[in-house]
A protein has these predicted regions:
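Substrate-binding/catalytic subdomain of NAD(P)-dependent oxidoreductase enzymes
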Residues: 1-114
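Catalytic, metal-anchored helix/loop core of enzyme active sites in primary metabolism
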Residues: 4, 9-10, 92-170
């Protein structure tokens, strides 16, 4: 599954970044900093999906060793399924800066359980939106998503430079 996802551009070029949780951790730090929280990746309670010692292997060796985790993950999947739940790798951040990333069982009717393929979801719970949180859901990986993100960033830079009039970036 991981090799297929990598070939389709749904993982980082080095899938260890995804399976270790570090890609999610960096994104969670960005979100935290937007909330004026002073955290870094070391402050996150991070549960990797695979043993860290695999990170010393080459990418090809790593992908080959992942097969050793199939039965363990299948057992977790079946355990969750018996409880009418699914497994999701979930990042959580609260207003005090407490951050966690781990594999969790979620009810099959939960919004996280409804994701397909490379979709991502973020749920914002605030004082105003506690009973009915704000939900943003959409594609989270792949070449077209990355390209549109870069294009959006370029538009933002262009608008900011236009406001500064006369200043340019080379």
């Amino acid at each position: 599954i991981i090799s297929d996802a990598k070939d389709k551009g749904f993982t980082e070029p080095d899938p260890r970044e995804d399976l270790s949780g570090m890609d999610v951790a960096r994104k969670l730090v960005i979100l935290a900093r937007e909330m004026n929280l002073k955290i870094n990746t070391d402050d996150i309670d991070l549960q990797s999906l695979v043993d860290q010692e695999l990170n010393d292997l080459s990418v090809d060796e790593y992908l080959e060793k992942l097969k050793d985790y199939d039965s363990e993950m299948q057992a977790k999947f079946q355990k969750a399924k018996k409880k009418n739940k699914v497994l999701r790798y979930i990042a959580r951040l609260n207003s005090t800066g407490t951050a966690t990333i781990k594999l969790e069982e979620v009810d099959s009717n939960h919004q996280f359980a409804q994701l397909n393929g490379s979709e991502n979801i973020i749920i914002f719970k605030t004082e105003r939106y506690s009973d009915y949180p704000l939900v943003h859901r959409g594609p989270g990986a792949g070449p077209s998503v990355t390209a549109s993100g870069i294009f959006a960033d370029l538009l933002m830079v262009s608008l900011q430079l236009d406001r500064l009039k006369g200043l340019s970036v080379e």
